[in-house]
Amino acid sequence: MLGGAFLGIFSGMLSGYIPGLHPNTFFSEFDPTYLDREDVLTFASACSAVNVPLSKVESMFLGVPDDQASVAVLIPLQRYTIEGRAEEAARLVALGTLSTGFFAAVALPYIVKIVGPMYVASKPIIPWLVLTILALQTYDNGLRGLAVFSASSAVGYVVLSGPLDVASPLEAMLSGFYAIGPGLSCLMNRTSIPKQRPGKPAISGKELPKCGILAALAGCALGFLPGLGPANVVSVLTRLGVDTTERYLLVTSGIDAADAVSSIVALHALGNPRSGASVFIQRSVGDITYPEVLASVGVYLLVSVLGAWLLIFSTRVLGGVLSGARARVLTGTVVLGLLALMTFHGLGSLGTAIACAGIGIYALRSGVDPSLCTSALALPTALKLLGVG
């Protein structure tokens, strides 16, 4: 068990700290024969628990805009960074992750009972729900949002169902959208990250449980919607009262935690893996029992405390190091490294990453929510569920 935990923590740190490296890369390509059943469950839970908070480091420090006017319509985490308050944002993410994980764990016995009927009832309308959320998000981003949606969807459809030889489509697209694109934008703008200062978020005592419960419910529901992430449902969340940056960070970070917990439950209750971690578990050990669900969720909650601490600690360290020209040097190194990696994977992967980077840059410069780029995954998946294409 300890071996699986240490391996999971290490993998979660790698995928959290290295831009463009997704934990699904480990889950899809990692096939250790020396791990027993207990180690497999521990590895998957620990990797997810560390990656969920640490994945926010990339958003905080990579591709930060060069003026606060643009930050207001882009990634809320970057607003804190450009104001020198990255540690405060990290603490909000940590609070959202831990509080929602707690509420999801408390509700676990009830989730196990309702997840089956809920899935059966919602299965026929799942693709329509995905399309509705994408349409709502596109509407909120205007004509430029429509351009990003159309271009991303076209690239995703061609890459996922076309004749292109792309070694790792998910890695190539996500690297282009959320690492290479923002990195190049930062370098072109010669963006300077200001010195970060220590800080703690000022939130009321009633705010945390409200956001935690909302995130737990939204995370469980989001798990049924393939191709979408927490940021995609912001158009829905703002209509439910998530109308401040603090609430947004608490809820979206919490949704990630709830989604991780509910995906383990779904594997047990439905035999249907809904995440990279649960696919890895099913491939390695098959279906899991209810006691194993409890053990996996327990490991997730325990290790998520470490993940939250690592996020705050890393933000404090990086906030002192990545200021001025040093941030541009690191960003340039990351971009060159990812381009070299895509080249190693082949021309198909490199071309996909460059195309997605161009879309990502356009989204950033035109004030479009970057999460709309995930329509590259969500739309082809929804169409496939509808039997189209």
Regions flagged by a language model, labelled:
Residues M1-G4, V40-F43, G145, F149, ...:
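Residue-level signature of transmembrane alpha-helical entry/exit and packing/kink sites
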Residues M1-R37, L160-G229, S235-G241, G337:
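Helix-loop-helix hairpins and the membrane-proximal interhelical loops
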Residues G3-G4, P32-K56:
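Extracellular loop-to-transmembrane helix junctions
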Residues L7-P23, V52-G63, L136-Y139, A215-P226, ...:
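Transmembrane alpha-helix interface/packing and boundary motifs in multi-pass membrane proteins
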Residues I18-G20, Y34-V40, Y139-L143, D165, ...:
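Transmembrane helix interruption/hinge and helix-loop junction motifs
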Residues F27-P32, Q78, L131-Q137, V234-T238, ...:
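Generic transmembrane alpha-helix motif of multi-pass integral membrane proteins
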Residues A44-V130, N232-V335:
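Helix-loop-helix junctions within the multi-pass membrane cores of secondary transporters/permeases
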Residues L92-S192, I288-G389:
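Membrane-embedded alpha-helical modules
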